[in-house]
Curated annotation (Swiss-Prot):
Main localisation: membrane
Location within or outside the cell: Membrane
UniProt keyword annotations, A-Z: Membrane, Transmembrane, Transmembrane helix
Parts of the chain that traverse the membrane: 64-84, 101-118
Domain of life of the source: Eukaryota
Name the UniProt record assigns to this protein: Uncharacterized protein YBR219C
Cellular component terms per the entry's GO annotation: membrane
Protein topology in the membrane: Multi-pass membrane protein
Organism, as annotated: Saccharomyces cerevisiae (strain ATCC 204508 / S288c) (Baker's yeast)
Amino acid sequence: MTLLNTLSNFGGTWPRLIIMSMINYFTVYQCTIPGTNKVYVTHGGSMQACTELLNGTVTILRDGYYITNLICIVVGLFLYFGYLKRKILHLQSLPISSWRFFHFFFTILAVTSRAIYYKSQNWRREC
């Protein structure tokens, strides 16, 4: 149970790391330093140097959330129409018997039990 919980935590953690990194990468910051006419524009990274070392103010020019959201939507559409839709239509075309969980095992069991039954019938006839 602990291993399952660990795998579940990993499954929910790494996508969040990727999304947050993309948001940070696509965000554009502007650092304005008071008393000078200098303005620094950067994207990604931390703006702590602007606020702590230079006593500047940080303004967000472009929020990376919207670009990341658009990228995820486009990737999702490509995945759906490129792969998932075909797979879903294939699964919908399967007969109901193939959806049963133990269908394969019950088929093998039925064939095996019939073979054993017929073998025992032939054994009785030989005696």
